[in-house]
Amino acid sequence: MQNIDLISEKEAQKLLEELADKIAAYNHAYYIEDNPLVSDSEYDQLFNTNLKLEQKFPHLILENSPSKKVGAKIANKFAKVTHQVPMLSLSNAFDEQDVRDFVDRIKNFLRLNEFAPIFCEPKIDGLSFSAVYKNGVLTTGATRGDGYVGEDITANIKTIKNFPHKIDNVPEFLEVRGEIYIEKQDFLNLNKEQEEQGKDKFANPRNAAAGSLRQLDASITAKRPLKYFVYSGGVTEQNLASSQDQLLTKLKECGFNINEISKLASSEEEIFAFYEYLKTNREDLPYEIDGVVYKLNDFALQNRMGFIARSPRFATAHKFPAIIGQTQLLSITVQVGRTGTLTPVAELEPIEIGGVTVSRATLHNFQEIARKDVRIKDYVFLQRAGDVIPKIMGVDFDKRPNDTATFDTPLFCLSCNSKLHYMPEDIIIRCDNGLNCPAQNYERIRHFVSKNAMDIEGLGRKQVEFLIDKGLISNPLDIFFLKEKNDSSLAKLENMDGWGKKSVENLFKNIEKSKNVSLPRFIYALGIRHIGEQNAKLLAREVGSYNNFIAQMELLRTNEPDIYQKLNNLEGIGDKILVDIIDFFDVKENIELIKKLGEILNIEDYKETREQSSLTDKIVVFTGSLPTISRAEAKATAEKLGAKVTAGVSSNTDLVVAGVDAGSKLKKAKELNIKIIDEEEWLTLIKNV
């Protein structure tokens, strides 16, 4: 077989025609005549060659392509793509004060005396993408995914009209980022086609764009009216330009679509004027927008500000006001989460708000129901802002029917019937029955296998529920013995409703694959209360390895003061979260489960992804007022260089940077003979590393 990387377009066309005929013959023999002509591996090699050719030359996809045929073995998932620079989300601003706070944070962080120009642009309500060019040729298209790892959509992105496949006069490696969307009228036309073909309609333009782009068959994507805008670079933007406005000008010259509706603001007044203009005229735009994005225009200043865990410090999204609607509340159901918290949910007469069909809304907590006097059959006001879960704002008392019914706060868990525990002020109600509560156990397993945890594909909500109901799994550990149990059972999983030979084979492969897991993902997968992805990374970074994690958690539960203080010094981990961690490890079954998982999983040690330097893993404390840089900038720089910045001085501290009016921390550092430097020495140090 020819090397696909070197093949010409003419050769590819001929080879695709040959493959189509050959695979069609093999499909007929295999599926119709039950008489395979080639081995599975030989068939797969031919089929994969066809797919790779179509990915490289999507405009050459044939009408009789084997990738379109029912009998063909179409790939069941996209390849993973790791983003060299994370595609983080933006922080939100909901009113003018939030925006002023954003501007003030920039001034304070950078110690600026005047307004730094802000680039303003519409926030398109679409699907984020990354496109990588090597030597000017598009090589990879990817979704944002979880911000760190996305899905390879190269073949699909090449089908979008006017999307450049080749560009000139750019660096050897170039990444651009943007938004793929569907215009309003195209969305209506697409839904009309879906309805005529007896298919489900899309809820909104964003879902339509996402569903169209994430097609395993690129020819389906090609038929969808997708459009795009680029709005930033990734790895190389500073090599192209020194500011956001210059970058967009350069990208436009390269042939990319940019949104011409933008504003370089030189004051807060200009920011708000642009926001009001877009808010007033948003309905006249051909596409959906849900706010305005503000970015520091100067890339050098952006670089100084850097990022926090989930978003850049130098940008924010000013969201448009929430859209209000009214509908009838049909009933109130109660959900039990993986940590036992009970949440009331309003079941509603379906209503369309801002292009989205809403049939459920959050009621937050039981006290909220009483405070707002919400009753079953009431007509309620709903609020929806962006992708936030809709919430009930209040009741239309003028329309209250005579037959409304009040909702009684439960005294016993609806899943396990154990007595509920009322938290302070009755705001939170919790079932403390742990894994003996079926609902908590189910949610815990669902969390364990989820994408950002163990990432076991093929174990969705329905599959987990099925396996629990059939007694095949009762805890996360059972998942890894599922194949062994299935092999020895007379009632095979592949013969049960909703399963098949291929889906079961894929599930077992994915379970096996998941056994190699990073320490942060493993900690997150455990489902400890208040330990989300970021806190899991903080803990993983602190302990370093699985064995250290187990050892330190067991010391923590025995109230070892040094361990408690060390973890308490981590930013994001405080007394409340430490209590939750201790409560989790106080449960004997939890420790046993984690140790057994440790025996069968390959839990990788924490890998530092930040810059490595002489400051890496050094514990640094800043105290007093620094003359020329803000404390926030100093802390951000230290962390970027691999240091751990803590709030308090201890015997573990490596360095104290003391500014003006340094107090007790400086005194303690001297008592412990810890190295102390001033701001000037700090700036020299970071310059040299």
UniProtKB/Swiss-Prot annotation:
CDD domains, per database record: BRCT_DNA_ligase_like (cd17748), LIGANc (cd00114)
Active-site residue numbers: 123 (n6-amp-lysine intermediate)
Residues where Zn(2+) binds: 413, 416, 431, 437
GO molecular function terms attached to this record: DNA ligase (NAD+) activity; metal ion binding
Cofactors required: Mg(2+); Mn(2+)
Domain of life: Bacteria
Enzyme kind, highest EC tier: ligase
This enzyme's EC code(s): 6.5.1.2
GO biological process, alphabetically ordered: DNA repair; DNA replication
Domain BRCT residue range list: 610-689
Gene Ontology CC terms, in alphabetical order: cytosol
UniProt entry keywords in alphabetical sequence: DNA damage, DNA repair, DNA replication, Ligase, Magnesium, Manganese, Metal-binding, NAD, Zinc
PROSITE patterns per record: BRCT (PS50172), DNA_LIGASE_N1 (PS01055), DNA_LIGASE_N2 (PS01056)
Signal peptide: none
Binding-site residues for NAD(+), renumbered to this chain: 40-44, 89-90, 121, 144, 179, 295, 319
Catalytic activity: NAD(+) + (deoxyribonucleotide)n-3'-hydroxyl + 5'-phospho-(deoxyribonucleotide)m = (deoxyribonucleotide)n+m + AMP + beta-nicotinamide D-nucleotide
Family listed: Belongs to the NAD-dependent DNA ligase family. LigA subfamily.
PANTHER family in alphabetical order: CHROMOSOME TRANSMISSION FIDELITY FACTOR 18, DNA LIGASE
Function: DNA ligase that catalyzes the formation of phosphodiester linkages between 5'-phosphoryl and 3'-hydroxyl groups in double-stranded DNA using NAD as a coenzyme and as the energy source for the reaction. It is essential for DNA replication and repair of damaged DNA.
Protein name, per record: DNA ligase
Taxonomic lineage: Bacteria, Pseudomonadati, Pseudomonadota, Alphaproteobacteria, Rickettsiales
